[in-house]
Amino acid sequence: MKREILLERIDKLKQLMPWYVLEYYQSKLAVPYSFTTLYEYLKEYDRFFSWVLESGISNADKISDIPLSVLENMSKKDMESFILYLRERPLLNANTTKQGVSQTTINRTLSALSSLYKYLTEEVENDQGEPYFYRNVMKKVSTKKKKETLAARAENIKQKLFLGDETEGFLTYIDQEHPQQLSNRALSSFNKNKERDLAIIALLLASGVRLSEAVNLDLRDLNLKMMVIDVTRKGGKRDSVNVAAFAKPYLENYLAIRNQRYKTEKTDTALFLTLYRGVPNRIDASSVEKMVAKYSEDFKVRVTPHKLRHTLATRLYDATKSQVLVSHQLGHASTQVTDLYTHIVNDEQKNALDSL
């Protein structure tokens, strides 16, 4: 979603919210939470407060009038009723064969509410230096997570990774084979952004950065000589990330056409651009997700940009057998998150079994 559209939608949602949600928004903006995260949270609050009005828990006329006391006095039974409402409301689910939203969606909703409650009961300060209230009903609400061993998760993910020669094969496919399948009109559209698309995908595969980190890169953040990019990690921390050498020609090809193709001015600082009505804009995450899905589905299997991050991490662990190195590359504080890659690269275990 383009930044301008995202901010417009955020403003519309903010106009609906109670004052304490607006305070929460400002507080999290200072952390900083990304606008995308805050937008998703505001959507969840809109859903929750709409239910509060519909269920009669509050007799306010509109969401913005719902008093803070409603959240303070919300019972565990009330919150469980909201969860049941989500499970049983079919219109919330695009798949009409299901009765309600998925458990993943419910967990996301509860996560947003937990964040709001934590702010109101622990983080915010009133004039006396105390939180607005102390009772946090969300601490009493259980969430159900999908039970799956690391080995099972690794096996599922492995099918959606471009390991070994498939990394370069994927890029070669986009560059050489994909255009041969296109109509003249589709080919013209493809050629307009070919170098940019290849540069983005090559960078994701060669660095393992998150999608948000990639789209927020500025031109000055790329050191092509050293093959290093400076990114803003989760929590606003700056980090320097090494980029594998195979991405260099794709980045060079894009930079060679960037200014002329996208009609840039000195004020256009974003590394990856898109043209909208003849005006260059920073490419948004949604556009990259669609692009990766399209190319990957044609090549092998439909994947998300996050699977390209998993691809880099798995290849790096396979080459080094170092969880510490992989953790540093991905920007993780501990090696626990990288345990997954030791299960994906399990040739030693399989070889041992084969020798029995």
Swiss-Prot record:
It is found in: Cytoplasm. GO terms for molecular function: DNA binding; site-specific recombinase activity; tyrosine-based site-specific recombinase activity. Pfam families: Phage_int_SAM_1 (PF02899), Phage_integrase (PF00589). GO terms for cellular component: cytoplasm. Residues 169-354 form the Tyr recombinase domain. One of its GO terms (biological process) is cell division. Belongs to the 'phage' integrase family. XerS subfamily. Site-specific tyrosine recombinase, which acts by catalyzing the cutting and rejoining of the recombining DNA molecules. Essential to convert dimers of the bacterial chromosome into monomers to permit their segregation at cell division. Required for resolution of chromosome dimers frequently formed by transformation. This is Tyrosine recombinase XerS.
